[in-house]
Amino acid sequence: MRPSARLLLLAVMLSGCASVATIDVAVQRPSPAEVLRFGVDTFAFANESRTNNPGKPDLYANYCFVMARGVIQFQRFARFEPGAPRLTADEYTERVKRVVARASWRDPLPPDDRVVIPGYASLHAFSHDQEAAVKAGLVGRFWTLVHWTNWRVVFPMPRWQQERVAREALAEVAEGRPVQLLVTNFPTWELNHTVVAYAYRQDSDGNVLFTVYDPNDPREPGRVTFDRAERRFEASRLYDTHVGPIRAFRMYYGALL
């Protein structure tokens, strides 16, 4: 690897919080309630698999990054008003585009400045009733596929770096902020995906169990485990993925990352 490439890789590995509590300290903080409410603050439809749906005419595939990011954007920049009159499908699409046009790492907007979604009480109810309109508004799939940090999946990462990701995720969730993670088991061509971590707990062995929203499965939460002894992540319960070691990286938490 060229020196310039090594420096770039090191910069990405070290990027993030300037000071993060050790994992022993961080995991003792209780996971706050309702950082994200599954089945309320999540989409009602799935990002679909091309492999599992060959020939499907209305296939909605390769939107996992858009959907995971969108859940955070709706949480930070939208406001639902169930008592207000409903809009047309085209008007709803424009509202969705306004929500997702704002970078997901930016601070939440105050209620009066948020994009109003009238006629629905939650993202789940909205995306269930107005699925086509919501999908039409979730733009930007191409840029997620070519995001410059996607190259991280091809490199083995040191265990200390993966522990740092776990510590940062714990710190963010403890402060009430869900965390989007890029997860991969490359070079196995099974998992190059993204999830949103929004809760955590310890198991009896002291491992950290992150509860995640998986865009591929709108029916139940997933789980990603950080094995503290091995200092690595595992796919404990991700849709259509074998249980086993993975690598995880934070996504969309800054202008370059």
Give short role names for the model-derived ranges.
Residues 1-8:
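Bacterial N-terminal signal peptides that target proteins for export
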Residues 158-202:
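Active-site-adjacent substructure of cysteine-protease-like catalytic cores
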